[in-house]
Amino acid sequence: MIVSRRLLLGAAVVLAGSGSYLLGRSTPKEDTIADPDAYAAKLGRQQGLTIGFGDPSTFYAPPYLPVDAPVEGVVLSPADRTAVKDSLHGISKAFEAYPEQCLGRIIKAIFIAGKILIDGAEAGGTYGLDWIFLAAPSNVSAETRRLTAELGVHHETSSFIWLRNDALQRAFTALEPAGWQFQNSATDQIARNGQTAPPVETGFLSAYGATTSENDFNTYAEIVFSDPGRLIKLAESVPLIAKKLALTLDSYIAVDARLHETFARNGLLKAAGR
């Protein structure tokens, strides 16, 4: 099992250290989802994938089978339907960053659980064989559920980009600081997240991103799609960040060439020297 494959629960810890992102967000619109099942189906058609919730034993997508639903070391609980609505709002917001049918080229499904435990540590998201899981616990605020889902789509989906691209892994890892101490366990990664972020000159965008190379890439992808302006400013002042940004953009464009226009329009390509 790869313990680095998780989104930490709670908005503050998945924002890659950008407190201003929270402050600048608009107030979510009043809940208008009357039928979560119908709304999930509509969203799924938009990106060419399945969005499901309910019994975690059903969390798989064809051609996979029920036996493929469980993930070693991961415990999922069913989500409350009211909480699911908040997550669907977040997923909808995340989908705005991608061309239609784009995410369906990367994953087959998104499943909304209640709590997600990885080796006993509570997480905001993780992934299975060809799908991702997002947490919608009832004991956090509606806005936390929305934001965890929004950023979780970017964060968890990016792991499939990472794991399927050996050249990307080699190039990205080669840019990490020599001798950097990464964290192998879920509990150690959570503990590192609570610490001060490394200097931006290291190329890491947050304390959590500095825990593993995969988490580092996840954090770049998360900010590319949720707060590109922040990455543009950093890339313009830190050459190492520009290099890692370029690798991130290239890896996504290789999956969907339409993203070249997206990244050109929002200024990321220019900031990355592409």
Give a label for each model feature.
Residues 15-24:
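Hydrophobic alpha-helical membrane-insertion segments, chiefly the h-region
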Residues 8-9:
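N-terminal export leaders
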Residues 23-83, 112, 187-198, 210, ...:
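Non-catalytic architectural context of zinc metalloproteases
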